[in-house]
Design a protein with these regions (language model features):
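Generic protein-terminus/edge-of-domain signal
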Residues: 1-60
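A hydrophobic/aromatic-rich effector-binding and dimerization subdomain
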Residues: 2-13, 66-110
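Short acidic-glycine-tyrosine-enriched beta hairpin
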Residues: 55-71
Length: 110
């Protein structure tokens, strides 16, 4: 069985950033298999029929799609059966430490 290349993405999120928001209109939605240490929340509009791959999971996306990718998780996207040329992608990237801060804040209010 052949090996699959996994790209190590260097995100624009700096250690000093709390989070980073990127809004990108796209004519197609494909991205090779990659990994990065940051968590990523992806919201997509008009990408029905595209495929998302996270770890061993392969799923076809709906018209509206929301996906949380854990830091270190291998993931990719493929246009597959997506016919739209008017795709909106909004990505929020953040460090795992933000989850710790938020969960500590919520627990302290209980």
């Amino acid at each position: 069985m052949g090996s699959v290349d996994v790209l190590r993405e260097i995100t624009p999120l700096s250690p000093e950033d709390c989070f980073l928001v990127m809004q990108r209109p796209k004519r197609s939605f494909s991205y090779p298999l990659h990994v990065h240490p940051e968590f990523e929340l992806n919201y997509l509009e008009n990408a029905a029929g595209a495929i998302r791959i996270v770890g061993d999971s392969v799923e076809e996306m709906e018209e509206l799609d929301l996906l949380l990718v854990a830091g270190g998780a291998k993931h990719a996207y493929s246009n597959h059966k997506c016919l739209s040329t008017d795709i909106l992608e909004i990505t929020i990237q953040f460090h795992a430490s933000l989850l710790i801060v938020l969960s500590t804040s919520v627990i302290s209010r209980l």
